[in-house]
């Protein structure tokens, strides 16, 4: 169904955020990354950036690619992660609502065509990106277990992902 594809199909799929290289981003004319936090960069119950995340962030910075965390997480969670590393962020973003996607674009100073959203959820990250008309990358969740608030979204996502698999629109496994 076209509506499912329009709303929930990401531009790209990767296994993890580390697979998103500056070379890939530059090849797609991307100058800024908006990324989810929980289960995209770190597990939802992991408070701090680990060495792999910090290395990835430095790789983006060294390539002049801007970064902003766009998270539905509360301010203390997101600020506690982002501020020690000088990362711009928007917490309590209410994704897939559009307002904070637009705010993120303003904070980054980039156009939609040069910005990409990275996230692990179709129902929030990808739907929001598609609604605001920016490219998106769906990553496999860092941790199989999610917070309680994500449970229903994951059940709906399974149905949508099965549809995408049946139509050969995705290539990686659950």
Predicted regions and their residues:
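Asp-based, Mg2+/Mn2+-dependent phosphohydrolase catalytic module
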Residues: 2-35, 42, 46-47, 52-117, ...
